[in-house]
Amino acid sequence: MASITLTPSEKDIQAFLEHYQTSLAPSKNPYIRYFLKLPQATVSIYTSGKILLQGEGAEKYASFFGYQAVEQTSGQNLPLIGTDEVGNGSYFGGLAVVAAFVTPDQHDFLRKLGVGDSKTLTDQKIRQIAPILKEKIQHQALLLSPSKYNEVIGDRYNAVSVKVALHNQAIYLLLQKGVQPEKIVIDAFTSAKNYDKYLAQETNRFSNPISLEEKAEGKYLAVAVSSVIARDLFLENLENLERELGYQLPSGAGTASDKVASQILQAYGMQGLNFCAKLHFKNTEKAKNA
């Protein structure tokens, strides 16, 4: 039976209780504040602030708090660089790419912090732990602003090759700081053949072999760290753009983005959209025709 112990914030505990309030059950243990009987798991929340999750579904419910099940592979237990990007699927905001260097002796610290793939963490949790990661973990962060993104897309780069360039540059600059990884993992966004094709266009190169792996953020803590820091960088950029324009900019590329894009186009013209959005997205044409 799986057993996981966590020490999340009181705010996260209350959010968990609110989400699963129908599963609350009585407990005779005086040290247990709350006890929940969930499908395939029980959750004991102690007066000390610790949480004990037990059962086959323990990992699923622990992920609510940012817990990440780490695969114990030989690669995971090596000092390695992992990279990830955030923003490529969002109309508004820039493109953030981060490379992080993590050693095995940092794994316990990262797990206790609740590091997981940024896609499973709330934005609030990401903003909370990202500053700690930036201070404790060697990394290289790059942000391509929307205006710079629009400048290079269609000229020298496309939506895939620009990511190849940023991942390569982030790794290159991190290696220049003297880190010595035994493995470099990129959260795969294209095939290895495509990556190598576009990499040939780049000036800054390194001899270390790289591995492109799908869902790498769930396998390697270094990639998970990069995912969190990149998400934080993207959110920070989005907030800065919002302050500049006076509009709330949604993440993603759905109908909410269409509506705001139309408003910005009316207020500032194409110059305004160029400042805050990736113009090659279909949202731009929808805004023009609104």
UniProtKB/Swiss-Prot annotation:
Function: Endonuclease that specifically degrades the RNA of RNA-DNA hybrids.
The keyword Magnesium belongs to this UniProt entry's keyword annotation: yes
UniProt-listed Enzyme Commission number(s): 3.1.26.4
UniProt keyword Nuclease present: yes
Organism field: Streptococcus pneumoniae (strain CGSP14)
Binding site for a divalent metal cation: D84, E85, D187
Family affiliation: Belongs to the RNase HII family. RnhC subfamily.
Name of the featured protein: Ribonuclease HIII
Record domain RNase H type-2: where: 78-290
Cellular compartment(s): Cytoplasm
Encoding gene, per UniProt annotation: rnhC
PROSITE patterns: RNASE_H_2
